[in-house]
Amino acid sequence: TAKGFSNQCATLRAVALAADYKEIEVETKRLDDCDLGPVGFIKIDVEGHEKAVLDGAHETLARDLPNLLIEIEEKHTARPLEESIAEVEALGYRGLCLRGGVLGSAERYLRERAEASERGAPAPLYIYNFIFVPQ
């Protein structure tokens, strides 16, 4: 059961809010425990809890190899973007992202971002939605 979290400010973290809000309890369960038929696509937008979702979906991912769209932001995960992407790719996926309407590899985006940082140049376009397709 998740309790004491808020979606005010687009987060599931317990935060102090100036606005009034109420708490509700919701049942949580692993995706692997949902007795689903074949799964072709999964959208994950859980404000830093991506690892927990993936950990609870290993059987589903291995069985169905669904395409994934995952919002990953370092400010929510408190870990390097490279680690989060590598974790999904280790499950047999290839990471992709859209930049200017063009689909490209997440690996290239990460490389260009690191190179810009090393040069002290502005980072490439900020990307937080990543597409993962089975390899």
Write out the residue ranges for each language-model feature:
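Proline-aspartate-enriched helix->loop->beta-strand connector
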Residues: 65-70
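Binuclear metal-ion centers of metallo-dependent hydrolases, dominated by the metallo-beta-lactamase
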Residues: 81-135
